[in-house]
Regions:
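All-alpha prenyltransferase/terpene-synthase fold signal
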Residues: 2-11, 20-362
Length: 362
């Protein structure tokens, strides 16, 4: 089934001819925004179905002794979700003319790494959340001990899966991909970002620079790896990979800004996880810091936003997205699209996913 979906996806995605490039990156963004031929919803559904299929085939128990830990791993891995990271990997691969078969193992690994981070983030020692994607979190069902080990096993399985299943790609590219995946998890990746995030809770002297470092590493690093590995597998040049990484870092920050806004504007039912956790834990977030920012550009709206947050999340209106954090997210997405201006119509999926990141409801 997975191979059939891969073949169908490869045939259904046709690279459009590259039109004459506008004079400036901003003009390119405007031109891309005006185009209506690309169906993002259909693209995302196609890639979601492909991702679900390859994920389901990627993990199974090999003996009775491993049944429990594999059950725990599969519970979180197959619990649904947006599957944005695999989509970004596939989109980057296609942008450079690569095959979905070549990038599929890396797409699986990216989602495994993401799932590992969610299992660990939800633990009582960290974010202490009982719900994820509308379901009880892993540790609630299996206990803290099994959840920790399931996350650990998920991480190691991600690397094993890439090494064993990536076919038709030069070995040096696979090694580069493994190195990128390793870096995005480590001290300068999501683990380092999570540590600084935890240690910043309740502190009043955390500034925007620190917050940007946290989320560039905690959130954006894995998105960066998703786009960059997809490009590497397809044979992109170093310069092209660098542009992809810049794009991904910007959408990663935009993703986190949108997440912070949703935490104070959406309900638990809409989010599929406990709403208001950031405020309750006194986490440093973009709404909190931008609400207190004294810059001329944001002064009036920021003060209003800050006062609302400090009073209670229940009083924050649906208009919160029009305040500074929402504008910042849109600015980041515009800048991200500019990074891909040289790729013309081939960048339509990545540009569409950038828009989706700040328009999503959960």
């Amino acid at each position: 089934m997975a191979l059939q979906l891969l073949a169908a996806a490869s045939l259904s995605y046709e690279v459009a001819s590259i039109a004459r490039q506008p004079r400036s990156p901003r003009a390119a963004v405007r031109a891309a925004a005006a185009a209506t031929s690309f169906d993002l919803a259909a693209y995302m559904e196609e890639k979601r179905l492909l991702t679900e299929s390859v994920l389901d085939a990627s993990l199974s128990s090999t003996c009775p002794e491993t049944d429990l830990i594999v059950e725990s791993m599969r519970y979180s891995l197959m619990a649904g979700g947006k599957r944005v990271r695999p989509m970004l990997c596939y989109a980057a691969t296609e942008m450079f003319g690569g095959s979905l078969e070549a990038s599929s193992p890396t797409a699986v690994a990216l989602e495994m790494i993401h799932t590992m981070s969610l299992i660990h983030d939800d633990l009582p020692a960290m974010d202490n959340d009982d719900f994820r994607r509308g379901k009880p979190t892993n540790h609630v069902l299996y206990g803290d001990d099994v959840a920790i080990l399931a996350g650990d096993a998920m991480l190691s399985t991600a690397f094993e899966y890439v090494a064993k299943n990536t076919k038709g790609v030069p070995a040096e590219r696979v090694v580069t991909v493994l190195a990128m995946l390793g870096q995005c998890v480590g001290p300068v990746g999501l683990a380092g970002g999570q540590v600084l995030d935890l240690k910043s809770e309740g502190k009043s002297d955390v500034g925007l620079d620190t917050l940007a470092w946290i989320h560039t590493h905690k959130t954006a690093a894995l998105l960066k790896a998703a786009v960059a590995t997809g490009a590497v597998l397809a044979g992109a040049t170093d310069a092209e990979v660098a542009k992809c990484e810049e794009y991904a870092l910007k959408i990663g920050l935009a993703f986190q800004v949108a997440d912070d806004i949703l935490d104070v504007t959406a309900s638990t039912e809409e989010l599929g996880k406990t709403a208001g956790k950031d405020l309750d834990a006194d986490k440093t977030t973009y709404p909190k810091l931008m609400g207190l920012d004294k810059s001329k550009e944001y002064a009036a709206a920021a003060a209003q936003f800050a006062r609302a947050i400090l009073r209670t999340r229940a009083q924050i209106s649906d208009g919160a997205r029009s305040h500074p954090p929402g504008r910042y997210a849109k600015q980041l997405v515009t800048e991200a699209k500019e990074c891909l201006a040289d790729f013309g119509d081939r960048a339509a999926p990545l540009n569409g996913l950038a828009d989706y990141i700040i328009q999503r409801k959960n």
